[in-house]
Swiss-Prot record:
Protein name per Swiss-Prot or TrEMBL: Small ribosomal subunit protein uS11c
Family: Belongs to the universal ribosomal protein uS11 family.
GO MF, one example: rRNA binding
NCBIfam families in the cross-refs: PRK05309.1
Subcellular locations according to the entry: Plastid, Chloroplast
Top-level taxonomy: Eukaryota, Viridiplantae, Streptophyta, Embryophyta, Tracheophyta
GO process annotations (BP): translation
Main location: plastid
Length: 143
């Protein structure tokens, strides 16, 4: 039986430097659109804002984590506000519809930030999924 010949200089060593800031360096500059749809997803742990064009193609997205917040600070109203401002500034919207999903603490703060940013809102919809007596909810937390 012959031994496998070890490879000299694997590709993993080359990619180590590239992976460190891959998220920030590979992000494309967002297209600038005048009319679009702003989707606000406010969970209890994070706030995610996605800006799409009227056809539904994603133009830009931002979350509290990408804005620099970590752990429990991602769930704060201030994080939701900063996330909304970041998404709108980058895209440069003038007219938009807003779709809000979830019941997190960043929900109202994100809506306030969108309204103050100067974007003309045509409608605000609550698209939070509500069960019609579907699955059994998880048991209550005991601390």
């Amino acid at each position: 039986m012959t031994k496998a010949i070890p490879k000299i200089g694997s590709r993993k060593k080359v990619r180590i430097g590239l992976r460190r800031n891959a998220r920030f360096s590979l992000r494309k500059s967002a297209r600038r659109i005048t009319k679009g749809v702003i989707h606000v997803q406010a969970s209890f742990n994070n706030t995610i804002i996605t800006v799409t064009d009227p056809q539904g193609r994603v133009v830009f997205w931002s979350s509290a984590g990408t804005c620099g917040f970590k752990s429990s600070r991602k769930a704060s109203p201030y994080a939701g506000q900063r996330t909304a401002v970041d998404a709108i500034r980058t895209v440069g919207l003038q007219r938009a519809e807003v779709m809000v999903k979830g019941a997190g603490s960043g929900r109202d703060a994100a809506l306030r930030a969108i309204a103050k940013s100067g974007v003309r809102l045509s409608c605000i919809r609550d698209v939070t999924p509500m069960p019609h007596n579907g699955c059994r909810p998880p048991k209550k937390r005991r601390l």
